[in-house]
A protein has these predicted regions:
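Short hydrophobic-aromatic micro-motifs
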Residues: 1-3, 8-11, 15-17, 57-60, ...
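Short capping micro-motif at the N-terminus of alpha-helices
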Residues: 1-2, 41-43, 92, 141-142, ...
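Proline-centered turn/helix-capping motifs that create local helix->coil transitions or kinks
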Residues: 121, 294-296, 373-382
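Short, amphipathic alpha-helical segments that act as regulatory/interfacial helices
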Residues: 284-291, 366, 370-377
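NTP-handling and nucleic-acid-processing catalytic cores
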Residues: 1-86, 158-191, 225-229, 252-266
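Conserved small/polar residues in nucleotide/adenosyl-binding loops
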Residues: 383-388
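Alpha-helical recognition segments enriched in aromatics with Gly/Pro capping
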Residues: 47, 75-87, 194-197, 201-350
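Residue patterns forming the tRNA-binding/recognition surfaces of aminoacyl-tRNA synthetases
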Residues: 53-207, 314, 320-366, 370-371
Length: 390
């Protein structure tokens, strides 16, 4: 088999071959032996294995690769997590590898495979590696316990209200984006390992049993009833996904779950104005949560506006350094020039590619209009120079 990540070898729990690959299909149902460990690996038939890539046989490491995880679920393969939180090889590997940084482990594994005559060849291979937006570090899939929402169940009503025109999109073409995402929705991971956010309202008992509660007092009462005695609890250290918290915004800001006068007056609202890039992040999730908790859609219409991108059509972001500050443009070229630029480029559903040169051209054009207008007014008998200045 070929791999770009030899360091994950100790987490391999299977080998996949394409069931239509004449070279390998006779081996399906048999076992291969994992080098350096001697563990038996079942050979499974799965279309994830591409006969035209490499040897056509793929090592499956369900705990450290997203695609392999899905293959593992389909074939009930074991999950073996081989890294600790520092990216070092843990105790699941042979002792000589334990504690090694994953990249140093890569080198040692290759050396040991070669020493045993098990390394066929090494070659350069170009492929896409995921990097952290802020850290710039290589991202490694890592198996952890997380909280999930059954988004498939919630999506059914959300699809229904748009199909029945209880919620409409403008431009209507964006409904396709909405439907495509909801009809193929996956379980939604709502727990995050970050500093900022709403703490997950889960407390754990001495045996790690979880208790969902409104607050710690409520959790302690539930735990006491369960254990028949008072116990200490520890709250889950994770926080909720920002988009989960945001999905509750239309009604949580109005005093829900209480039937406040604000909730009765302002929920549901009429119109939501937003960009297409968060139709599934926010719009769909607000609709799902609104229908689930209040039995009403949170709004009646969704107006999708364009995104303002840089001159190359890329989305503006701080990490790319391509953000154009509207305040700086206004200070340099004037608010009328910026308004005219955006108005002239805007059309329903189409993004705007903005550059400072466009705003400068609009400023020059606006100056000509201004000067022409002053010239006309100064030459009208009914106007004075003071009126022209105004």
């Amino acid at each position: 088999v070929a791999t770009t990540r030899p360091e994950t070898l100790f987490g391999d729990t299977g080998v996949a071959v394409n069931p239509n690959d004449e070279r390998w299909k006779r081996f399906i149902g048999k076992n291969a032996i994992l080098p350096l460990v001697g563990r038996k690996l079942p050979i499974v038939g799965d279309e994830h294995a591409d006969p035209d890539q490499g040897s056509g046989a793929v090592k499956i490491t369900p705990a450290h690769d997203f695609n392999d995880f899905e293959v593992g679920l389909r074939h009930k393969l074991n999950l073996i997590s081989i890294f600790d939180k520092e990216g070092k090889i843990n105790e699941t590997a042979p002792k000589s590898y334990q504690g090694l940084d994953r990249l140093k482990a890569r080198e040692k594994i290759l050396e040991d495979l070669e020493a045993q005559g098990l390394l066929e060849k090494k070659e350069k291979y170009e492929y896409t590696i995921p990097f952290g937006d802020r850290s710039g570090e290589i991202l490694e899939p890592f198996l952890t316990d997380q909280w999930f929402v059954d988004a498939k169940k919630l999506s059914k009503e959300a699809i229904k209200v748009v199909k029945e025109k209880k919620i409409t999109f403008f431009p209507q073409s964006w409904e396709k984006t909405y439907f495509d995402w909801l009809e193929n929705i996956q379980p939604w991971c709502i727990s995050r390992q970050i500093w900022w956010g709403h703490k997950i309202p889960i407390w754990y008992g001495p045996d790690k049993k979880p208790f969902a509660a409104m607050d710690e007092k409520d959790a302690l009462n539930k735990a006491e009833k369960f254990y028949k005695k008072k116990v200490s609890l520890v709250q889950d250290p994770d926080v909720l996904d920002t988009w989960f918290s945001s999905s509750l915004w239309p009604f949580s800001t109005l005093g829900w779950p209480e039937q406040t006068k604000e909730f009765k007056k302002y929920y549901p609202t009429n119109l939501l104005i937003t960009g297409f890039d968060i139709i599934f992040f926010w719009v769909a999730r607000m609709i799902m949560m609104g229908l689930f908790f209040t039995k009403k859609p949170p709004f009646k219409e969704v107006y999708i506006h364009a995104l303002i991108r840089d001159e190359k059509g890329q989305k503006m972001s701080k990490s790319k350094g391509n953000v154009i500050d509207p305040l700086e443009l206004t200070n340099k070229y004037g608010s009328d020039a910026l308004r005219f630029t955006l108005s002239s480029l805007a059309s329903p559903g189409r993004d705007i590619k903005l550059s400072t040169q466009q705003v400068e051209s609009s400023r020059n054009f606006s100056t000509k209009i201004w000067n022409a207008s002053r010239y006309i007014l100064l030459n009208c008998l009914l106007y004075t120079s003071d009126a022209a200045d105004e």
